[in-house]
Amino acid sequence: MTSVLRCSRTLLLAVSGLLAVPSPLAAQQAPAGPAPAATAQPAPSGQPQTPPPWAQGRPDTDGAAKLAPVVPPPIAAAADRLPVTQLKTPKNFNIEVYASGMANARSLRISDKGTVFVSTRLLDKVYAVVDKDGKREVKTLVSGLYRPNGIALHNGTLYIAELNKISKIDNVESQLDSPPKPTLIYDDLPSDEPHGWKFLTVGPDNKLYFNVGAPCNICMPSPAHAQIRRINLDGSGAEVVARGIRQIVGMDWHPVLKQLYFTENQRDWLSEDLPQELSEDLPQDKLNRVTRPGQDNFGFPYCHQGNLPDQQFGWGHNCNEFTQPIALLGPHSAPLGMRFYTGNMFPREYHNAIFIARHGSWNKTVKVGGDIVVAKLNPDGTVKSVEPFMTGFLVNNNYIGRPVDIELMKDGSILISDDWNGAVYRVTYGAPRVSMRR
């Protein structure tokens, strides 16, 4: 009887969630053809088969058993094999290869002198792309790091966030050929692998902001998890900015309101009690903003997508207790990097809009994401619309690229990293042109 009641409640919540929050993005790029089977390796005979963290709560169905995280190629694609000609943008936007040969290219930062720094998550490196005599050269700036996903630049100092520590390299551009070992500034961080990688940015208050993800698909996190923190540039003065956040891989500041916006990846496998098609379509990932620093709670693990109580942890809670998302970005679309557009190259309609990289789903039979969308805002910072901007990374339900981060160049063009191909693309507006420069 208990299981019947739990199933009925979960199904009711799921249906209400689907009816209450339609998403124009959820139906994008509905590719033809089934997803390729991706099965986990069985545990050795005689050993308990403990599921990996990503499989926590996975329904015991044949369809769900075929879904697993998508592993990127182990090496970067050659420049002439990159999918530039298959990517689509609105009229008069142009795409070119800015740099290639950087396996697992993730976060992007551009210095005042034009050096582009590129992090990795699965490798141990941070790259630097240097323009010399009209040719771009890719250097391995530093190696031997652990999950160095987060990077930030401020006054000539490069900050690097690894799994459980943050370090810095002062005067980094004067030492590109022989950089020193990074100097540790902060290590009061958990060492959990699930959602342990960081995104790093410097706020208008000259403080470093970063995420500490929940160490699970769904669980009751410790007081040290599921939050945004900030520290002074020397690592002192740590404080919590917001709580109730499952996982962030992108943040940026509204150029006028100076409020922090961030993408959030919601839980997987909503319930083993649900039909697989409902479990795959709920919940939707989110775009959030912090309006009450130190007080905002975005609901994890009690509430998902702003209106859907968790079937395990949601009892006794109302989703209205928590800070609501300002946009929903599709189920399991994995929104990562995001950037407010403050340049002068693109048409006026994009001014102060947010470009968001949706890395793409893995736990959906028909995948969504693998694209760039643009959120256009009202003057009060709320979202007016979310529209496709760059598509083509997802072909016949298979990835030929996966966008991660977005950065704005001085001339108003934008850079987009692709960790599937180990490349960075540049998007310009104006007379059509194609370049395959490395």
Predicted features along the sequence, with ranges:
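Beta-rich catalytic cores
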Residues: N104, L122, E137, G144-R147, ...
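Surface loop/turn motifs at the tips and blade-to-blade linkers of beta-strand repeat domains
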Residues: V97-M102, K139-G144, I185-D192, V240-G244, ...
